[in-house]
C-alpha cells in the first residue's frame, strides 16, 4: 500500500466581491492526503457550526493521493459578527486546524 499522507489544508475567506453581493462563503481546501477519508468540522469563535456546511467526497488526484473541499455558506452579517472561523480537518486520528478572521476594515 501507500504510506499515509497528512492533508495540507488551506482556508479561504469570502471575497470582497462576494460580500458586496451579500453572500459569504468560506472554502476549506484539503489536499494530498492518503487514505481518502477525512472528517471536516467548522467552528465560529471555537463553537461548532453545523448549518450551511457542504463537504465534497474525496477524489483521487493524479498523484494517487486524495483531495476534498468543504464549503461554509454564511451571510455577511454572520461573517462579520464573529472574530474567527476555523476549518478543522481530522485524518487518521490527527487534526489540522486553519483559522481565518474577518478583516476589521472592509
From Swiss-Prot:
A GO biological process of this protein is: adaptive immune response
Give all residue intervals belonging to the Ig-like domain. 7-101
Sorted alphabetically, which keywords does the UniProt record give? Adaptive immunity, Cell membrane, Disulfide bond, Immunity, Immunoglobulin, Immunoglobulin domain, Membrane, Secreted
Q: Which cysteines are joined by disulfide bonds?
A: 28-87
**Main subcellular location of this protein, as a coarse class:** secreted
Note one Pfam family from the annotation. Answer: C1-set
Instruction: Enumerate the InterPro entries for this protein.
Output: Ig-like_dom (IPR007110), Ig-like_dom_sf (IPR036179), Ig-like_fold (IPR013783), Ig/MHC_CS (IPR003006), Ig_C1-set (IPR003597), MHC/Immunoglobulin (IPR050160)
Q: Could you tell me where this protein is found in the cell?
A: Secreted; Cell membrane
Gene3D superfamilies hit by this protein: Immunoglobulins
Q: Which GO terms describe its cellular component?
A: extracellular region; extracellular space; IgA immunoglobulin complex; IgD immunoglobulin complex; IgE immunoglobulin complex; IgG immunoglobulin complex; IgM immunoglobulin complex; plasma membrane
Q: List residues traversing the bilayer.
A: none
Gene Ontology molecular function, alphabetical: antigen binding
Outline the subunit composition: Immunoglobulins are composed of two identical heavy chains and two identical light chains; disulfide-linked.
Known role: Constant region of immunoglobulin light chains. Immunoglobulins, also known as antibodies, are membrane-bound or secreted glycoproteins produced by B lymphocytes. In the recognition phase of humoral immunity, the membrane-bound immunoglobulins serve as receptors which, upon binding of a specific antigen, trigger the clonal expansion and differentiation of B lymphocytes into immunoglobulins-secreting plasma cells. Secreted immunoglobulins mediate the effector phase of humoral immunity, which results in the elimination of bound antigens.
Instruction: Share any extra remarks.
Output: Displays the following serological isotype: Mgc-, Ke+, and Oz-. Mgc- has Ala-6, Ser-8 and Thr-57; Ke+ has Gly-46 and Oz- has Arg-83.
State the name under which the record lists this protein: Immunoglobulin lambda constant 6
Q: Which organism is it from?
A: Homo sapiens
Amino acid at each position: 500500500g501507500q504510506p499515509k499522507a497528512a492533508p495540507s489544508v488551506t482556508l479561504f475567506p469570502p471575497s470582497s466581491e462576494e460580500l458586496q453581493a451579500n453572500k459569504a462563503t468560506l472554502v476549506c481546501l484539503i489536499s494530498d492526503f492518503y487514505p481518502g477519508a477525512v472528517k471536516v468540522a467548522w467552528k465560529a469563535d471555537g463553537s461548532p457550526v453545523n448549518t450551511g456546511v457542504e463537504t465534497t467526497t474525496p477524489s483521487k488526484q493524479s498523484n494517487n493521493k486524495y483531495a476534498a473541499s468543504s464549503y461554509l455558506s454564511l451571510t455577511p452579517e454572520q461573517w462579520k459578527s464573529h472574530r474567527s472561523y476555523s476549518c478543522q480537518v481530522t485524518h487518521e486520528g490527527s487534526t489540522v486546524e486553519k483559522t481565518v478572521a474577518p478583516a476589521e476594515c472592509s
